[in-house]
Amino acid sequence: MTNKYLVEGSENELTTKTAAELAGLIHSREVTSREVTQAHLDRIAAVDGDIHAFLHVGQEEALNAADDVDKRLDAGEAPASALAGVPLALKDVFTTTDAPTTAASKMLEGYMSPYDATVTRKIREAGIPILGKTNMDEFAMGSSTENSAYGPTHNPWDLERTAGGSGGGSSAALAAGQAPLAIGTDTGGSIRQPAALTNTVGVKPTYGTVSRYGLIACASSLDQGGPTARTVLDTALLHEVIAGHDGFDATSVNRPVAPVVQAAREGANGDLKGMKVGVVKQFDRDGYQPGVLEAFHASVEQMRSQGAEIVEVDCPHFDDALGAYYLILPCEVSSNLARFDGMRYGLRAGDDGTRSADEVMAYTRAQGFGPEVKRRIILGTYALSVGYYDAYYLQAQRVRTLIAQDFAKAYEQVDILVSPTTPTTAFKLGEKVTDPLEMYNFDLCTLPLNLAGLAGMSLPSGLASDTGLPVGLQLMAPAFQDDRLYRVGAAFEAGRK
């Protein structure tokens, strides 16, 4: 199977080039940022009726930002960043002052934020035009974008299948040539899982290294913004733009940004000699799609052929990660989403003079939240209630500690861990929507990393022999060793060419 949206490209070859290539053309003045931005806006107009990657397209704002870059470059100024002038798609969970921020929920339909998220601000300061805001599962709760209040995103590889979630819009935009760069968020795999299903690269940085200020919270101890692109180098260049300490975020870590771009360039030689790669025993067993396991084993053998030493690693508490995650996350959701009460901002329903304030609040939440969000609020509220807090929430936090200890022990033996990113390739839209537990299981390989706050990457590892659809290879690195992801990821990418 091929991705006709990218393989066949479009009338304009600018939409099939990498971000690094586009930056080189713009900075050398062979093309203008306006030309590149307009090409991608035209591409969005041509194919987004099929894909539905975007919830909002800001044509005027994007072109104005591109013109500003061109003006500065023509005046002889140095580029504001290595990606200045290259346009980007932004997940609709980061606040923006010039475009609606809805988190794909009716609760925030049409909401205009009075401030930019720190990630948004850094993108603007880097001279990167924002093409628009991408589709997602409502409040980042889901694995397929089917929980979006505005309809699902379709996978460019097969329009009947999901592009993943929660950030399926960002990855689909990359895969369809609608954007060369995109930003996502990852709570339990929402960057890495869509990347795997769309044959793109997605990175969940170490927790605390990318600011969450202005990121609409799902689960505050798990959420992390991160970069996505079509190549490892492009992803590294964007990572460098958005990472860094932020005084507006109490969980932001004050330490130097890992040298991710340097690592990606060094890894491009394809050499993995001296690298110890751990294969996680719990993620390499029967029950996964045969084509996924076949591609994973081929990827491991490729790394061996590139000089890596392969070691099997046992992480026994990973088997308990799913249960712990789906207790901790709903508890944090229950707390975070209490702010959407119909009183201060967002939707206010049923305020016709016949209802009390409490009734208006209840009616607003009933009308504004979708079924999955309500399910998680109820589950979290129950788990936090008197008599159940110790039995459920605290026990889940103990398991979380054990998972972090499993990772720590593993990194005493190896430099990096690998696994399939997802148990199967992209499933058909509607296939799992009536079975929440089946949907939750799809994040099995990705969520342990979030519980431990470590760094992870998904990158293309070929097509499954049984479905012809993309398979992702997941790399997992210790905290604050994000550059190791890029070193190994770039080498693996080079070895596949």
Swiss-Prot record:
Return the annotated region ranges for Disordered.
143-171
The UniProt entry, under Pfam families, shows:
Amidase
Which GO CC terms are listed, alphabetically?
glutamyl-tRNA(Gln) amidotransferase complex
* The keyword Transferase belongs to this UniProt entry's keyword annotation: no
Show the active-site residues. Answer: 91, 166, 190
Domain of life assignment: Bacteria
Q: Which GO terms describe its molecular function?
A: ATP binding; glutaminyl-tRNA synthase (glutamine-hydrolyzing) activity
Q: What's one GO BP annotation on this UniProt entry?
A: translation
Keyword list (alphabetical) reads: ATP-binding, Ligase, Nucleotide-binding, Protein biosynthesis
Write down the EC number: 6.3.5.7
Q: What class of enzyme is it?
A: ligase
* InterPro entries xref list: Amidase (IPR000120), Amidase_CS (IPR020556), Amidase_dom (IPR023631), AS_sf (IPR036928), GatA (IPR004412)
Q: Which reaction does it catalyse?
A: L-glutamyl-tRNA(Gln) + L-glutamine + ATP + H2O = L-glutaminyl-tRNA(Gln) + L-glutamate + ADP + phosphate + H(+)
Any signal peptide, and if so, which residues?
none
The record's similarity note reads:
Belongs to the amidase family. GatA subfamily.
What HAMAP family does this protein map onto? Answer: GatA
Assembly information from the UniProt record: Heterotrimer of A, B and C subunits.
**PANTHER family named in the record:** GLUTAMYL-TRNA(GLN) AMIDOTRANSFERASE SUBUNIT A, TRANSAMIDASE
Q: Main role? A: Allows the formation of correctly charged Gln-tRNA(Gln) through the transamidation of misacylated Glu-tRNA(Gln) in organisms which lack glutaminyl-tRNA synthetase. The reaction takes place in the presence of glutamine and ATP through an activated gamma-phospho-Glu-tRNA(Gln).
Q: What is this protein called?
A: Glutamyl-tRNA(Gln) amidotransferase subunit A
Gene symbol here is gatA
